[in-house]
Every structure is written in structure tokens, then in C-alpha cells.
Amino acid sequence: SEKRAKGENDKIINKKVSSALKNNLKVIFCIGETILQKRKKMTKKILLNQLNKGLYKIKKKENILIAYEPVWSIGTGLVPKSEDLNHVISFIKIFLRNKMKFKNPKVLYGGSVSPQNISLLRKVINLDGFLVGGSSQNSKKFIDIIKKTFI
């Protein structure tokens, strides 16, 4: 999501995904909207566009995880409300199953994940895990997240 915000286009992202899969790598495909797009109620449209273009003609879907990473949330400490996050994750999974033929889509949350919000994020029922960014660079914070997730 951050790369898109800095100008990396969908065609380049699609080539990177294709190349990674051809080399038997797992892919975490990040999608997300900016704060302006969110305010304009464009989240679904933006996510569909990113999925359609970024995964265009991709075959090995079982090696892809999707990370919903709202650009407006990354590193800010701001997190979508649980019900909003649940709604977006459900929307992504339904689209992946029905339109992109994913058998069992896995969706991670990759906005601001921290020791302070991990307990709330864990309550989002259809979330399959987390893509931890800044907090993973601090061992104490990262261990705290792990403990609160698994213990």
C-alpha cells in the first residue's frame, strides 16, 4: 500500500507478484485506501481495482495472502472500527472467492498493529492474522504482540 502511495503502479506490482510466484515464493499482496479515498466512500472501489489489476492473470492463488493495509492507518496508531474492519475483510474474501476463484482466501490486517490495539484487532472474527510493521522493529513491542496473540 505504501509503495502505491509513492507511485508504484499496478502493472509493476502485477509483474512482481507473477515473478515471485514463478520462483515459488509466497506473496503478501497489500491493498488499501488513502484517507481521502476513505472520506469519499471509495474504499471498495479502490480495493477492487487494486485486486483486479495487481492479480491480473495470476494462477497460483494458493500462494497469496492478502493484507488489508489502509494507507491512512500505517504508522499512525489509527485503526478502523472493528465493525468497519470486519465489513471490509468480508467484502475482500467474498470478492476473492466469487470473482477471482480463490479457494480459501486468507486476509491479514496490516495497518497500525501494536501492543495497545492487538487485543481489539483479535476480536475481528474473519481476520486471519496480522502484518506487523513498525512494532516489529522493536523487540519488546513485537514480543508483547505475540504474547497477546498466542498466550
PLM region spans:
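Active-site loop-to-helix "anion-binding N-cap" substructures in soluble metabolic enzymes
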Residues: 1-151
